Regions:
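Short glycine-rich phosphate-binding loop at a beta-alpha junction
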Residues: 2-8, 179-182
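A residue-level signal for conserved active-site and pocket-lining positions in enzyme catalytic cores
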Residues: 5, 19-22, 199, 334
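Cofactor-cradling patches in redox/metallo enzymes
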Residues: 6-16
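Short Gly/Thr/Asp-enriched flexible loops that form oxyanion-binding sites at enzyme active sites
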Residues: 15-20, 80-82
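A glycine- and small-aliphatic-rich helix-loop capping segment at beta-alpha/alpha-beta transitions
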Residues: 22-25, 85
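Long, structured ligand/cofactor-binding scaffold of large enzymes
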Residues: 24-33
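Non-catalytic alpha/beta scaffold blocks inside enzyme catalytic domains
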Residues: 32-366
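Long, low-complexity segments enriched in small/aliphatic residues
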Residues: 196-197, 349-405
Length: 405
């Protein structure tokens, strides 16, 4: 019988990889919708080839001129939006430094700066929550946003462009010491990414401190895209092959957000058994024959590929409640029910990471992202709580109370 797995950009690398390793590439889908997968693939190629710097969130705060091209950053990347709010204050910090006021003297810095902000040019198709700190706001449709970006790149390269908006943005970026270009895939227009990359690359020819940041929609969108190859299935192909599939294993993915109404109805009408692993209630669980409760990010360990293309590890701070288990453990248990031994011998998280590192050259350094379970700090494990944790004995008083006689 054929079992097909659908991964998720919400889940970490490890369970996505285990699902692919267990069922094989020809029976695995990354869980990205077709337009989303195409856009993120293009985004990863841009990040790997751009001559501009790809900044961290902290580095974005140092920008002294910012261009947002076709991305509602407050919705897709709120932490980056906060960094941009910090960045526009750099003008007041420069004024304070010239006046001899230390940066930590916040009240004095704000009083001196008043409404003086570093330039922020927002070019989007709707209002955004950054409009209140923007110096220039241009509301255009997606086609016009892409054309704006290409015209701006041409102007930065010395071309003759008469458009006043383009000339204004070009002057702002050329006068900056650390310009930042921000874009992403939420505009659902393939040329917006290309135009943003062209602006950053053109600007970097004259300014090596130029930065380019491209936002992705979910925590591990980049990781899910990197697990795709020429043998893996798209979501469309999975739906087309439903009559040849006996069981679907869906990993932390709400397909109602990624499939059209007709495709979702076809899945509901099929005789496929669906096993879902998830921590959140969603419409996909209503279609499932079995639901396995997965641990949340705060109760499990995993690796994400962030918007920079950098691997980041997260660690559990709580024990999974009730019957919940990390997704990778559920997959190991499911695999052990059959005769397939591909996931046998995976006793701890480090074993999964080691298997991932040995599977492909691009993952060869993944086991160096963070220390393994054998790591000790002066002979002790890293505690989840401080030694003097207030209310420790009262946390579970509703379940059990231990008092001296």
């Amino acid at each position: 019988k054929r079992v097909v797995g659908i991964g998720s950009p919400r889940a970490s690398l490890e369970p996505n990889f285990l699902l692919k390793h267990w069922l094989g590439p020809t029976n695995f889908s990354s869980g990205l919708s077709d337009p989303e997968a195409s856009a993120i693939e293009k985004l990863t190629k841009i990040l790997s080839s751009t001559t501009a710097n790809v900044p961290s969130v902290r580095q974005m705060e140092s920008a002294d001129a910012i261009l947002i091209l076709g991305e509602d950053v407050s919705n897709t990347a709120p932490r980056i939006a906060l960094a941009l709010r910090q960045a526009v204050r750099n003008e007041s910090f420069s004024m304070a430094e010239a006046a001899g006021i230390p940066k930590w003297q916040d009240a004095a810095v704000r009083n001196l700066g008043q409404d003086e902000l570093s330039p922020l040019v927002v070019v989007t198709s709707s209002e955004s929550r950054l409009d209140d700190v923007a110096s220039h706001i241009y509301c255009l449709n997606p086609d016009e946003i892409a054309d704006f970006g290409f015209s701006l790149a041409e102007k930065l390269n010395g071309g003759e462009i008469e458009d006043e908006m383009v000339c204004t943005a070009a002057d702002i970026l050329l006068q900056a010491n650390r310009p930042l270009v921000v874009s992403g895939i939420s505009g659902s227009h393939p040329d917006i990414l290309s135009s943003a990359a062209m602006v950053a690359d053109t600007l970097s020819m004259s300014n090596k401190d130029t930065m380019l940041s491209l936002c992705v929609p979910e925590s591990n969108s980049m990781g899910a895209a990197l697990l795709r190859d020429q043998n893996t299935l798209s979501l469309t192909e999975v739906i087309e092959q439903l009559d040849k599939i006996d069981t679907l294993v869906i990993l932390e993915n709400d397909l109602s957000r990624r499939l059209g109404k007709n495709a979702l109805q076809k899945l509901a009408d099929s005789k496929v058994d669906i096993i879902s692993l998830d921590v959140l209630e969603n419409d996909t669980l209503n279609l499932s024959s079995m639901v396995l409760p997965a641990a949340s990010f705060a109760e499990s360990e995993g690796t994400l590929i962030n918007f920079e293309g950098r691997a980041q590890r997260y660690f559990p701070v709580f024990e999974p409640a009730n019957e919940r288990l990390p997704s990778w453990q559920w997959l190991v248990k499911l695999a052990s029910l059959g005769s397939d031994e591909k996931l046998s011998g995976l006793d701890c998280f480090d074993d999964v990471v080691s298997l991932l590192a040995s599977s492909d050259e691009k993952w060869s350094e993944i086991d160096k992202v963070a220390p393994g379970q054998a790591f000790r700090d002066r002979g002790q494990k890293i505690p989840r709580q401080t030694h003097r944790y207030s209310g420790r004995t009262a946390m579970n008083a509703s379940v059990s109370v231990h008092e001296p006689p």
